[in-house]
Design a protein with these regions (language model features):
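Divalent-metal-activated hydrolytic enzyme cores
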Residues: 1-27, 60-66, 73, 77-78, ...
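Divalent metal-coordination and catalytic microenvironments
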Residues: 11, 32, 56, 85, ...
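N-terminal short beta-loop-beta anion/metal-coordinating cradle
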Residues: 13-17, 22-48
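Short hydrophobic segments within beta-strands
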Residues: 33-35, 86, 149
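Gly/Ser/Thr-rich loops at beta-strand to alpha-helix junctions
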Residues: 36-39, 89-93
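Short glycine/serine/threonine-rich phosphate/pyrophosphate-binding segments
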Residues: 40, 65-68
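Short helix-loop-beta junction
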Residues: 47-55
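Ordered, amphipathic secondary-structure segments that act as subunit-interaction surfaces
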Residues: 77-88
Length: 162
């Protein structure tokens, strides 16, 4: 049985007790951008319930044009007002450089990716960079409540980056 088949069986059990549709806008008016790392259960880390927040994930939890697009939709069309950023210790994005990664892909495929992997060397600095990208974006109208954190994968604690 594949992992997907197991997840489909889990969904059958979930659907049996599903409470029904929730409103489209998040009830807490929050958008979270976090790393896709499987060790981060964003809902548990923040104590989020279903329907409370938009959770946007990518490699590193970095702010790219696509995250700006998602945040603009979240704020402009669905009423979110707060943004929470979550990076984490022991992140894979700390283990390589963009140039090395792109070079390896080019060596393998013959094509150098046009996109940036957005690897970084310093967690706190990258959180600050992500906040700065949001603040600089004309597409994000609500910028009063943007906070960034580093999740410690050993202790389970969030540490705010200032």
């Amino acid at each position: 049985m594949s992992a997907t088949d197991e997840y489909l069986a889990n969904n059958e059990r979930y659907a049996e007790t599903f409470a029904g549709p929730l409103p489209l806008p998040p009830s807490r008016h929050v958008a979270v951008v976090a790393c896709m790392d499987a060790r981060l259960n964003v809902y548990a880390i923040l104590g989020l319930g279903e329907g409370e927040a938009h959770v946007i994930r990518n490699a590193g939890g970095v702010i790219t044009d696509d995250e700006i697009r998602s945040l603009a939709i979240s704020q402009r069309l669905l009423g979110t007002r707060e943004i929470i950023l979550i990076h984490h210790t022991d992140c894979g994005m700390l283990t390589f450089t963009d140039d090395d990664f792109k070079g390896a892909i080019q060596d393998e495929t013959g094509i150098k990716p046009a996109w940036s992997a957005e690897a970084f060397r310093d967690l706190d600095e990258d959180v600050r960079q992500s906040v700065a990208r949001i603040l600089a974006s004309p597409f994000i109208p609500h910028k009063d409540e943007i906070r960034g954190f580093v999740f410690d994968v050993i202790t389970g604690k969030l540490n705010e980056v200032s």
